[in-house]
Amino acid sequence: MLKKEINVVILAAGKGTRMQSSYPKVLHKLGGKTILEHVINIAKSVKPKKIILVYNNKEKEIKSKISDTSIDWVIQKEQKGTGDAILKASKKFSDKDDIVVLYGDMPYISIESIKKLFTSKKQSDISLLTAYVKNPDGYGRVFKKNGKVIKIIEEQDANFHEKKIKEVYSGTFIANGKDLKRWLNQINNKNIKKEFYATDIVHFANLENSTIKTVQVLNCKEILGVNNKLQLSILEKIFRKKQVNDLLLSGVTLKDPNHFILRGILKHGKNIEIDTGVILEGNIILGNNIKIGVGSVIKNSFIDDQTEIKEYTIIENVKIGKKCIIGPFAHLRPKTVLDDQIHVGNFVEIKDSIIKKESKIKHLSYFGNSEIGSQVNIGAGSITCNYDGVNKFKTIIGDNVLIGANTKLIAPIKITKNATIAAGTTLTQDVNTPCLIYNNKEQKQKKNWKRPQKIIKKTDQ
């Protein structure tokens, strides 16, 4: 017998009105990714023949965030229920394939639980993913008689006794495509909400004496969904705890695990030390022997071995070499590349610049659109004046240049290697020889000068 292929249907057409948001529920972020991206990753993990995504009329918003070309898109213009959504998706799947249904707002279903469904399907016509919970409020109840699944009863349609049932249905199931289409075409909307419930297929499967099995999730948290911002915050907390545990087990030292946030993916070497209040976003790569100080924020960046990021430093889309010292209170902006042994000190901002080995910018400076050579030392309060209100211009500084404090470099400008720029200089022309550059500024003295006195107003008396 040939092995059946898997199609995954993801239901993501709900309006999500309880989120009190102007954009779709499934596009809210969880751990740096949209909820829907998490579910798509779950779907991909089973290596399906096809992923079919049912969405609502927010097509442009959803497709702008989900650019995966392998997905088959199906629109549900009117929200008539989950049964109607799967029926619309059924035009995209084959009778002979097995169909797994996932919900776009349930990002924690595990691959292990889905594999249990696959195993169960070998001995059943339809297998349902369920959980035993202490508080079943809000979930459909699995109604059984003598151990046999009879039907799924939605919360709003359940009577007093049915609401006491502790086995609840997650919404995820697996069934053959041909069977599923037949059952879907029999459901109606004769219920309190006047919707076509996907859960009704269990009733029709039972009428045919089909074999219906239930499979329990490995962890009850897997069935948690998102309907409002409170539930999203609960899922975020669970997600963060798992991330922290994984990092600790992988050897990362977190000084305060309860106040560390990772919104993305962290790849790291050995001897990583992260202090309290640090936020990492996007794709982060850390080498060996890295220290990150209190309150730092790092986004989509690479940091090489033996580099220290001091307190309250912000780094975004930056590549940093080995044995660098950055901060405290430094700001490295996109397109910045630092070579090895660079020192960027407090209140220094660098944007779209390349800085070569062993150079230093240690205090109160701004460098944008710059190329800085090796062993350059830049004094406090130095800035590149790189913008004329319309265009950005480049500053190029050669190797072993010394720039004194409070210097202004009016771009476009180039300074040759070994040149020295005196403190307080405003540089407007290229420096083509390794000389000393300074501005003549006469120091004047005004004798018998007195400081102005404060004028005392009547209201001050």
UniProtKB/Swiss-Prot annotation:
Its EC number is 2.7.7.23, 2.3.1.157. It is found in: Cytoplasm. Pathway: Nucleotide-sugar biosynthesis; UDP-N-acetyl-alpha-D-glucosamine biosynthesis; N-acetyl-alpha-D-glucosamine 1-phosphate from alpha-D-glucosamine 6-phosphate (route II): step 2/2; Nucleotide-sugar biosynthesis; UDP-N-acetyl-alpha-D-glucosamine biosynthesis; UDP-N-acetyl-alpha-D-glucosamine from N-acetyl-alpha-D-glucosamine 1-phosphate: step 1/1; Bacterial outer membrane biogenesis; LPS lipid A biosynthesis. InterPro entries: Bifunctional_GlmU (IPR005882), GlmU-like (IPR050065), GlmU_C_LbH (IPR038009), Hexapep (IPR001451), MobA-like_NTP_Trfase (IPR025877), Nucleotide-diphossugar_trans (IPR029044), Trimer_LpxA-like_sf (IPR011004). SUPFAM superfamilies: Nucleotide-diphospho-sugar transferases (SSF53448), Trimeric LpxA-like enzymes (SSF51161). Pfam families: Hexapep (PF00132), NTP_transf_3 (PF12804). Acetyl-CoA binds at A380, N386, Y387, A423. Binds 1 Mg(2+) ion per subunit. GO terms for molecular function: glucosamine-1-phosphate N-acetyltransferase activity; magnesium ion binding; UDP-N-acetylglucosamine diphosphorylase activity. Residues 251-461 are annotated as: N-acetyltransferase. Residues 230-250 are annotated as: Linker. It catalyses: alpha-D-glucosamine 1-phosphate + acetyl-CoA = N-acetyl-alpha-D-glucosamine 1-phosphate + CoA + H(+); N-acetyl-alpha-D-glucosamine 1-phosphate + UTP + H(+) = UDP-N-acetyl-alpha-D-glucosamine + diphosphate. Keywords: Acyltransferase, Cell shape, Cell wall biogenesis/degradation, Cytoplasm, Magnesium, Metal-binding, Multifunctional enzyme, Nucleotidyltransferase, Peptidoglycan synthesis, Repeat, Transferase. Mg(2+) binds at D105, N227. The active site is at H363. GO terms for biological process: cell morphogenesis; cell wall organization; lipid A biosynthetic process; peptidoglycan biosynthetic process; regulation of cell shape; UDP-N-acetylglucosamine biosynthetic process. Its main location: cytoplasm. NCBIfam families: glmU. Catalyzes the last two sequential reactions in the de novo biosynthetic pathway for UDP-N-acetylglucosamine (UDP-GlcNAc). The C-terminal domain catalyzes the transfer of acetyl group from acetyl coenzyme A to glucosamine-1-phosphate (GlcN-1-P) to produce N-acetylglucosamine-1-phosphate (GlcNAc-1-P), which is converted into UDP-GlcNAc by the transfer of uridine 5-monophosphate (from uridine 5-triphosphate), a reaction catalyzed by the N-terminal domain. In the N-terminal section; belongs to the N-acetylglucosamine-1-phosphate uridyltransferase family. This is Bifunctional protein GlmU. It comes from Buchnera aphidicola subsp. Schizaphis graminum (strain Sg). The lineage of its organism: Bacteria, Pseudomonadati, Pseudomonadota, Gammaproteobacteria, Enterobacterales.
